[in-house]
């Protein structure tokens, strides 16, 4: 257990980023994530909003409890009560630690905006934070506390995103494109400030650090101005494309249903 939690440092050599152990572990998580989302989503699809929301409440409590437990272990392990400052929810995937509880516990426009935000970014964060987390799987053994908790919380983010889609909880109103982007922009601003104060790399706004962000970093030759602007620009493009793909799929499904009704 001491080795699993990393007390005194991990003695095992990391299997490596994109090793078969890494891919097997995260793929198993993704399969479980999708199956659970489909199961709960279809089960609650035709129920009232209160019944649908119970799953979000459970997801919010579980994901934040797991994260708090991780922060406690990190502080104890490092013997530094301020070690949690380097685990703030200021990455694209960890924003869900705030967004999912907002989607679960609030009402009205805040709830709708949070639901859409989780729907748009939850699955992306799950994939990016598992398959493309080179900064984790290159440093820690696959079955270590850091990677297991990270994989678990990212999977909950992806599960919640898929559940919102399948249970039809997302509003996806066009005005929420700007709301979603504004939320993300606010976190980017907070990340820039935290990076300045802590000399860290929240939201990967200082460099890719073994993630797909490296593509943008190399494209702009590591420019400290163009790189973060490029990251924010691609976030905006992703949001717009995601919304329009959603509208297209909704239109196509509606058209198919109309044709079926006409034939009958």
Spans of model-derived segments:
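Alpha-helical transmembrane segments in multipass membrane proteins, preferentially the mid-helix core
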Residues: 34-39, 99-103, 156-175
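A glycine-rich, hydrophobic loop/mini-helix early in the fold
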Residues: 51-104
